[in-house]
């Protein structure tokens, strides 16, 4: 028990209780959609009566409660129950006079009365255990007390005999009452004769000291927040002091009976159906309850003190009690019984007991009550459960979040966002201000000591005048309540915003952007559509905020654009606006508003004080009234003038001073005590503000309370000075000179500011000061902006004074010990060179500078570096006249003082003097030469012209000279340098502007140019298809024309073919014929294979296979050869026209000095001219020969199977062709638009020139083949070209390069121009000879003696039909004509090995692999692979072919 009572002041919370509380909260959690269920309420805890510390005599047990048995009839009416309770209380008080009885302390003055009981034997609400009435007078018999005890025992037995039923099946009130009865049964045993040693109840922690209540830290929130005095808006009752007596002497006749109040209380049958109705119903209950409390206090003031009970604050701080009370509140009427009003008068009795002497009876009762003050847990339940006139279960009440305790009501201060204030209830007010006047008004005015206490109060009030001043000055913010206590709260809520606004003027814009939703509705739209009542200030506030945000946003944009200066221009001066009548009227209204406010405060204070005086006088006894009266009399009407002196000399309280007390000087009177300061209007400060600072001259008048509204004051100089300092509210004055109103603040001063103070630099002034001349910055000045004036140099004292090294007064000692520094030149710097001495400008020295130089040399002992640094000006730009180098200073000093005789003879100084003399002589010689030359020019000019002679410019010397005044041209040089720099910058700027203009123009032009639409792949495919269709159409037309011409020519020559074939097939022909090959198989001359009769088999000509296997045709002019483009059908045919193909001989031996075959030799313009001339002649000859042809033989078409047979027979050719032909045949595209065929030598023997010419003429080959001769500016597509060299037999060369190389070898000393001219002549001769040969070859070809049968190597697309004119014979490769441009040519990596197959411009020419040997391929037999490479060529040269065909 000792350990349990030791913690009486702590909050009761154990693990079991926390578990029950958590279970209850989870079951009624409104956030989970659950409603309040009373069945989840845990059982209430009962609190035991602490053990008795001092028990003298065992007395009759005082019952703590009077329960009603559920088996008996309903309880009696209210008056009867009240009378019985009074008797029980009286008997208990009588026993307390003689002995100390430990009893539970009462909570309520009046016990609760049980109402009518229902027929189902439900327990009625009963009194809480531990509630007892104690009276100071015994007027009740003892048997009634015994009867009450017997009834208590019966009620306990009946209660215990009831069967246990589930809580869900019982009525909430029934369950609650049974829990209470159970607790009561445990608390008070029925067979115990006395309460001397009671048993503990549920281990309740009690107070260890008598008279000290158990404090609970937290007051539980009431579920019905406004149903009683202990709602969440009402603070917990203030605990009484341990030393305060809890009882007082009150006569029994002054005890107020609750009959009159209870008679007016009726049970409310209203049941709310909506949450709003529930809130309004609770608010009405709260208002009515407060009205009853106030009326009860007023009634108690007239009947005497109402405190014979004390409220103990050790109420359980649990939600269980609150929920039980909430459940029991369903049977409570809207108007509570007087038990809930009684605590309000309790503190007054506690305070009153301090000043009243206790009688023996009162002391005995006080001791009985102050032993222990405990309250049973059913106290609040008893308050809430009153008698119910209507039996039966009450209708269910709507459960809301407020009623269930999930949320609580907010006070008006919380809703308005004001600083939280501790509410002062009427219960706490006597504790907060404990004044004797309060106790006098509480009902002790009948005491004989009241007047004396009133006089003591005056002295106490005089002491209160030492508080801080509460004078309110104009233009001063009204101090809010509790300034000192609420500083932290304000700092947390609003000080941060104010701090941000002071530091950053853009804070308003930031808040507007931060709290305004980006896509939400603006505040303006919300205000325009608001459903609440809005004033003009609300709209103006939003308008002002919008205007500020617009201004700040503009400022923010200008700041980012570097266009917002920190200092703004001052507003332009405008004439002041003349004041109008409206301004005067507004000024009158302002000061009248202040006057009326202050006057109203004064009237309120005066009326309150007068009312308090009247109340005090009425409630006082006759003796006190005599002390309160003012000794005055009504002056007679005949002598009104006598009142003045009498009132002037009389010392009276301020209550009688009806006139102005300030006009009469008399001593400070004793002020009449006024009422409490809490009832003053809210506009006036209730208490002295501790936040106000001391005034300049603190005086008593500034520390008066609010109730002291009049006082007397001596008109001393100090008082007059104080009054003069007070603000005076007067209307605007009219200036006598201008007859205009003289305003304190101009009408436009509020908005017409000079500049907007957006930063600290806005209103600040920049002070300029005269700086000292710039000085040379020392190497020890580390700061860039440091100046000597701000940090003056302070000479530090030496650390050691016993060192005489740097002290000037010890210099003579140093000179004796150590000889002075000897004379020396500035040897640390090299001696000036002779060139510098000749070209330097003389330095100028004034007399003052010479003297300074002497003094420095003497002071620093020939330290020329230090002397130079002292004499060098501080400017960074040093002119020649101001040059002060160490050697310059030494030279000047030597010129003034002269060198010592011993030093001038040394070799060092001799060299120095010699260098200076030599430089001087050279300078003089140069000046003399320039002067002589100028004179000669003048003489020549005078002889020829009468021009004026130019003045001779004499150059000054190079040695330092003395001047009286040095003319400084440094500023001129600086200006010139600045001008040049500015001009340079302007030039650069102009160039940049010009470039930017050009760029802008170019950009505009480029933007205006229409861009071609971006074609899709489908568009490209469509264009390609259309182009191919056009090419096929043109090719088909051209093919039909060529077929018709061939048929006509073949038909015309049919009669001449047999004779020519006999001449060509003869084995014993002239040497110019092709040698006979005995190994060749016999060939018939018929056209069995589809060949025309005019074309014979090449094997019959005596040549192996007729032509080498690798001989191909390069298609240069498609309209001549009749080549077809890709994708179209091709009739492989060849015209027997002699001009259709020309064969060009190739030398059997290549010369080492000849150009490589794959290199172009047309680098010089002469070669190009020769090539163009040759191409022109060839074109003329070709046209002439084509026109002379009478007819052509038709060419039959070949079938695709024959083409396949031809391909299969190709690799089966005998190897003798490789042995016979060892040259490198190449077909080169020519600009003459006809194919060229390079014919190698046969079997290493030189070919006959006549035969080669015949072959060339018969094959339609033109010679010489040249690059870059394509018409219409189309370059030669192929990088490889055949470069046939000169024949070993001396045949005519066929290329310009070979002709030139041959001429240069024969004539090495011949100039290049002659070589070119001779080359051109030989070329013309060659062309004439070839023209003659062509006519002969044409005749032979027409006769069929020379069968030049090309092999058309077909592609594998099936559209190309080759010609098989001979079985096993060589094929001439003809590619497909592709429609590619030469620009789309892709270089092949294998051009050396594959020219005709992989996209080479040679278009299918079979090219042998080049030999790796140094031996020319033309001299090696069997080294050439004659096999052709199948495949269609993708040469870009076919584009030019298609163009030619289209032409």
From Swiss-Prot:
GO biological process entries: chromatin organization; DNA repair
Protein's cellular compartments: Nucleus
Limits of the HSA domain: 569-644
Domain Myb-like: 841-899
Biased segments, Low complexity type: 231-247, 925-940, 1180-1230
Coiled-coil region(s): none
Principal subcellular localisation of the protein: nucleus
Biased composition (Polar residues): 150-173, 219-230, 305-323, 353-369, 379-389, 1231-1248, 1408-1447
Biased composition (Basic and acidic residues): 332-342, 428-438
Region feature (Disordered): 60-271, 300-443, 636-689, 923-970, 1003-1023, 1180-1248, 1381-1447
A molecular function GO annotation: chromatin binding
PROSITE patterns hit by this protein: HSA, MYB_LIKE
UniProt-listed Gene3D superfamilies: Homeodomain-like (1.10.10.60)
Keywords on record: Activator, Chromatin regulator, DNA damage, DNA repair, Nucleus, Transcription, Transcription regulation
GO cellular component: NuA4 histone acetyltransferase complex; nucleus
InterPro entries according to UniProt: Homeodomain-like_sf, HSA_dom, SANT/Myb
Free-text function comment from the UniProt entry: Component of the NuA4 histone acetyltransferase complex which is involved in transcriptional activation of selected genes principally by acetylation of nucleosomal histone H4 and H2A. The NuA4 complex is also involved in DNA repair.
Family as reported in the entry's similarity comment: Belongs to the EAF1 family.
Quaternary organization: Component of the NuA4 histone acetyltransferase complex.
Protein name according to UniProt: Chromatin modification-related protein eaf1
Native organism: Emericella nidulans (strain FGSC A4 / ATCC 38163 / CBS 112.46 / NRRL 194 / M139)
């Amino acid at each position: 028990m000792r350990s349990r009572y030791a913690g009486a002041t702590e909050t009761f919370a154990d693990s079991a209780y926390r578990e029950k509380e958590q279970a209850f909260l989870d079951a009624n959690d409104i956030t989970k959609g659950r409603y309040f269920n009373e069945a989840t309420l845990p059982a209430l805890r009962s609190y035991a009566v602490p053990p008795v510390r001092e028990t003298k005599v065992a007395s009759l047990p005082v019952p703590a409660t009077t329960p009603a048995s559920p088996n008996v009839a309903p309880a009696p009416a209210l008056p009867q129950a009240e009378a019985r309770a009074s008797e029980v209380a009286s008997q208990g008080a009588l026993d307390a006079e003689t002995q100390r009885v430990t009893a539970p302390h009462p909570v309520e003055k009046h016990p609760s009365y049980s109402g009518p009981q229902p027929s189902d034997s439900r327990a009625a609400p009963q009194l809480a255990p531990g509630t007892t009435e104690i009276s100071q007078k015994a007027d009740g018999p003892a048997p009634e007390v015994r009867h009450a005890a017997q009834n208590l025992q019966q009620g306990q037995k009946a209660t215990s005999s009831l069967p246990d039923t589930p809580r869900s099946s019982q009525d909430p009130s029934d369950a609650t009452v049974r829990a209470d009865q159970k607790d009561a049964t445990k608390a008070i045993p029925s067979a115990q004769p006395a309460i001397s040693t009671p048993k503990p109840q549920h281990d309740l922690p009690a107070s260890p000291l008598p008279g000290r209540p158990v404090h609970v830290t937290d007051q539980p929130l009431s579920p019905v927040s406004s149903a009683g005095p202990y709602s969440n808006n009402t603070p917990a009752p203030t605990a009484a002091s341990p030393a305060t007596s809890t009882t007082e002497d009150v006569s029994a006749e002054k005890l107020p009976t609750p009959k009159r109040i209870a008679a007016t209380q009726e049970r409310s049958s209203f049941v709310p159906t909506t949450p709003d109705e529930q809130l309004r119903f609770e608010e009405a209950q709260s208002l009515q309850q407060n009205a009853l409390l106030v009326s009860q206090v007023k009634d108690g003031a007239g009947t005497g003190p109402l405190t014979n009970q004390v409220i103990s604050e050790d109420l359980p701080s649990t939600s269980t009690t609150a929920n039980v009370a909430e459940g029991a509140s369903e049977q409570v009427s809207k108007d509570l019984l007087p038990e809930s009003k009684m605590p309000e008068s309790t503190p007054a009795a506690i305070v009153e007991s301090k000043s009243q002497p206790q009688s023996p009876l009162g002391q005995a009762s006080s001791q009985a009550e102050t032993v222990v003050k405990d309250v049973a847990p059913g106290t609040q339940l008893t308050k809430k459960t009153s008698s119910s006139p209507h039996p039966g279960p009450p209708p269910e009440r709507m459960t809301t979040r407020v009623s269930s305790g999930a949320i609580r009501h907010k006070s008006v201060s919380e809703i308005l966002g004001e600083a939280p204030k501790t509410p002062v209830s009427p219960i706490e007010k006597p504790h907060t201000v404990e004044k004797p006047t309060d106790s006098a008004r509480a009902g002790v005015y009948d005491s004989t000591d009241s007047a004396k206490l009133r006089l003591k109060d005056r002295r106490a009030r005089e002491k209160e005048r030492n508080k801080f001043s509460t004078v309110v000055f104009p233009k001063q913010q009204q101090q809010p309540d509790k300034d000192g206590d609420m500083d932290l709260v304000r700092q947390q809520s609003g000080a941060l915003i104010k701090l941000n606004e002071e530091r950053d003027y853009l804070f308003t814009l930031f808040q507007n952007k931060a709290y305004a939703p980006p896509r939400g509705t603006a505040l303006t739209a919300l205000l325009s559509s608001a459903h609440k009542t809005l004033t003009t200030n609300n709209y103006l506030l939003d308008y002002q905020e919008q205007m500020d945000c617009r201004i700040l946003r503009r400022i923010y944009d200008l700041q980012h654009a570097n266009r917002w200066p920190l200092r703004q221009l001052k507003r332009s001066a405008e004439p002041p606006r003349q004041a109008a009548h409206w301004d005067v009227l507004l000024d009158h209204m302002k000061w009248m508003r202040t006057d009326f406010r202050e006057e109203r405060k004064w009237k309120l204070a005066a009326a309150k004080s007068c009312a308090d005086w009247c109340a005090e006088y009425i409630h006082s006894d006759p003796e006190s009234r005599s002390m309160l009266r003012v000794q005055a009399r009504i002056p007679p009407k005949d002598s009104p003038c006598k009142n003045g002196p009498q009132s002037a000399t009389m010392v009276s309280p301020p209550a009688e001073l009806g006139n102005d007390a300030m006009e009469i000087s008399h001593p400070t009177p004793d002020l009449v005590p006024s009422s409490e300061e809490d009832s003053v209007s809210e506009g006036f400060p209730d208490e002295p503000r501790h936040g106000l600072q001391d005034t300049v001259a603190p005086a008593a008048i500034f520390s008066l309370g609010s109730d002291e509204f009049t006082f007397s004051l001596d008109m001393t100089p100090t008082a007059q000075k104080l009054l003069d300092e007070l603000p005076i509210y007067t209307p605007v004055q009219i200036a006598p000179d201008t007859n205009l109103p003289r305003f304190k603040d101009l009408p436009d001063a509020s908005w017409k500011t000079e500049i907007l103070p957006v930063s600290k630099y806005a209103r600040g002034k920049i002070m300029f000061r005269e700086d000292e001349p710039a000085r040379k910055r020392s190497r020890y000045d580390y700061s860039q902006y440091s100046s000597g004036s701000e940090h003056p140099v302070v000479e530090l004292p030496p650390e050691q004074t016993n060192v005489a090294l740097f002290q000037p007064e010890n210099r003579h000692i140093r000179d004796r010990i150590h000889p002075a520094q000897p004379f020396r030149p500035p040897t640390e710097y090299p001696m000036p060179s002779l060139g510098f001495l000749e070209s330097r400008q003389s330095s100028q020295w004034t007399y003052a500078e010479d003297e300074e130089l002497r003094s420095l040399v003497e002071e620093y002992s020939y330290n020329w570096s230090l002397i130079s640094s002292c004499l060098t000006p501080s400017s960074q730009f040093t002119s020649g006249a101001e040059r002060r180098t160490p050697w310059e200073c030494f030279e000047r000093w030597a010129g003034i003082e002269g060198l010592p005789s011993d030093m001038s003879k040394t070799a060092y100084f001799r060299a120095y003097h010699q260098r200076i003399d030599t430089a001087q002589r050279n300078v003089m010689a140069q000046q003399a030469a320039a002067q002589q030359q100028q004179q000669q020019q003048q003489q020549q000019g005078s002889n020829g012209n009468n021009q004026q002679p130019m003045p001779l410019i004499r150059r000054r010397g190079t040695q330092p000279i003395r001047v009286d005044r040095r003319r400084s041209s440094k500023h001129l040089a600086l200006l010139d340098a600045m001008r040049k720099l500015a001009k340079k910058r302007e030039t650069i700027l102009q160039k940049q502007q010009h470039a930017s203009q050009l760029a802008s123009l170019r950009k505009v032009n480029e933007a205006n140019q229409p861009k071609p639409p971006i074609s899709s792949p489908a568009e490209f495919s469509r264009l390609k298809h259309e182009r191919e269709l056009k090419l096929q159409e043109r090719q088909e037309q051209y093919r039909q024309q060529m077929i018709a011409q061939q048929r006509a020519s073949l038909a015309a020559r049919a009669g001449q073919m047999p004779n020519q074939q006999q001449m060509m097939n003869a084995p014993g022909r002239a040497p110019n014929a092709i040698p006979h090959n005995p190994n060749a198989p016999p060939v018939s001359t018929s056209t069995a294979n589809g060949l025309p009769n005019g074309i014979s088999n090449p094997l019959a000509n005596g040549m192996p296979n007729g032509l080498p296997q690798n001989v191909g045709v390069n298609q240069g002019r498609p309209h001549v050869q009749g080549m077809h483009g890709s994708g179209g059908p091709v009739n492989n045919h060849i015209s027997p026209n002699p001009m259709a193909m020309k064969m060009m001989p190739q030398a059997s031996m290549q010369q080492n000095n000849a150009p490589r075959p794959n290199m172009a030799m047309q680098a010089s313009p002469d070669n190009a001219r020769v090539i163009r001339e040759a191409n022109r002649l060839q074109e003329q000859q070709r046209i002439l020969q084509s026109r002379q042809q009478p007819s052509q033989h038709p060419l039959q078409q070949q079938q695709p199977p024959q083409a396949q047979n031809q391909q299969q027979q190709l690799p089966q050719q005998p190897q003798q062709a490789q042995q016979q032909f060892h040259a490198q045949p190449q077909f080169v595209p020519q600009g003459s638009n006809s194919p060229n065929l390079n014919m190698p030598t046969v079997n290493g023997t030189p070919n006959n020139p006549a035969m080669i010419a015949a072959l060339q003429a018969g094959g339609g080959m033109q010679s010489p083949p040249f690059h870059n001769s394509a018409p219409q500016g189309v370059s030669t597509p192929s990088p490889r070209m055949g470069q046939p060299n000169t024949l070993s037999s001396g045949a005519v060369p066929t290329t310009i390069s070979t002709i030139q190389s041959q001429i240069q070898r024969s004539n090495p000393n011949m100039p290049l121009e002659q070589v070119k001219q001779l080359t051109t002549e030989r070329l013309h001769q060659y062309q004439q000879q070839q023209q003659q040969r062509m006519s002969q070859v044409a005749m032979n070809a027409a006769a069929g003696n020379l069968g030049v049968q090309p092999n058309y190597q077909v592609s594998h697309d099936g559209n190309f039909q080759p010609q098989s004119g001979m079985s096993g014979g060589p094929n001439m490769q003809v590619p497909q004509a592709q429609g590619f441009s030469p620009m789309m040519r892709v270089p092949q990596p294998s051009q050396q090995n594959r020219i005709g197959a992989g996209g080479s411009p040679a278009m299918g020419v079979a090219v042998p692999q080049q030999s790796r040997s140094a031996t020319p391929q033309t001299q090696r037999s069997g080294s050439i692979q004659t096999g052709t490479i199948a495949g269609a060529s993708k040469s870009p040269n076919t584009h030019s072919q298609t163009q030619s065909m289209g032409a």
